[in-house]
A protein has these predicted regions:
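HIT superfamily nucleotide-processing domains
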Residues: 1-138
């Protein structure tokens, strides 16, 4: 690792929805992708294979719970799961609700936009997201 500060060690990385000491789930403020969440490991680890098998399972349980909650509450056409870490080498997963008319569909959200006239979606009810995550994970 470098001596560069880690933004996910130094800040929550979004609006905190759920936390258990092992990982946290945050809602990211992204006007193009309403409901985009991150599942962030609490300690600084770079890769999934740096975790013990039981820890991998525990982290993915949080990722899958986040996907299920977003599907139930937001009814997206698709949900993308991504763990890149090229910019922030701190293990985290993006859980991204997608709609056929979003700016980048069907490409990844980091690609060039495929349309300029994508409709804005209302912000999700953060309290409903948080409560649904607690029901699934606590």
């Amino acid at each position: 690792m470098t001596d560069k500060p880690c933004e996910l060690c130094d800040s929550p990385g979004g609006d905190l929805l759920w936390r258990d000491g092992f990982c946290r789930i945050v809602l990211v403020d992204d006007p193009d992708y309403s409901g985009l969440c991150r599942v962030v490991l609490e300690r600084h680890v770079k890769e999934m294979t740096d975790l013990e098998p039981a820890e991998r399972t525990r982290l993915m349980k949080a990722v899958f719970a986040t996907e299920a909650v977003l599907r139930a509450l937001l009814d997206p056409d698709k949900v993308n799961l991504a763990s890149l870490g090229n910019v922030t080498a701190h293990l985290h997963w993006h859980v991204i609700p997608r709609h056929q008319r979003d700016r980048h569909f069907p490409g990844p959200i980091w690609a060039e936009p495929t349309r300029a006239d994508a409709p804005q979606r209302p912000a999700p009810d953060r309290d409903a997201l948080s409560a649904a995550l607690k029901r699934r994970l606590d």
